[in-house]
């Protein structure tokens, strides 16, 4: 696993990269980077089409196209826990390994409106993906 942090627009990465970001189980996608995913990929509609009414039971990863939606909380106004984020990352890892995906790009997940600490989140990413050969690019602006 290789994790790099780059000052870059997430949506300008090479198409070989699958994207990942955090969402709530109510699929609100009304603010922050989640809103940009909804605008660019009609993500809210796609999530409802594929998963319907989703009930939060812990961290989970819902894949739509080349986007991994990390469900880390029930409602959009709540804050996630590191436990839920870890569960979502572990679920994403299983899917990435199964699908033989080698390149992931994401924002500073959980650290914008969700207010998690990047140092702890980076540590989780490194632990979860340690035994893979996935290239993770973290984009920030």
Give the predicted meaning of each segment.
Residues 1-141:
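Macrodomain-like recognition of ADP-ribose-binding/processing modules
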């Amino acid at each position: 696993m290789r994790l790099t942090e780059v000052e870059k627009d997430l949506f300008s990465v090479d198409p070989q990269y699958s994207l990942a970001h955090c969402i709530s189980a109510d699929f609100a996608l009304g603010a922050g980077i989640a809103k940009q995913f909804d605008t660019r990929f009609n993500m809210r509609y796609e999530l409802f089409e594929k998963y319907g009414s989703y009930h939060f039971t812990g961290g989970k990863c819902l894949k739509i196209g080349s986007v991994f939606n990390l469900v880390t909380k029930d409602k959009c106004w709540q804050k996630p826990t590191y436990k839920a984020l870890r569960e979502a990352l572990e679920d994403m890892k299983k899917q990435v390994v199964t699908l033989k995906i080698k390149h992931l790009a994401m924002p500073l997940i959980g650290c914008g409106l969700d207010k998690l600490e990047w140092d702890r989140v980076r540590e989780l990413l490194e632990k979860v993906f340690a035994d893979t050969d996935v290239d993770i690019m973290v984009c920030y602006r």
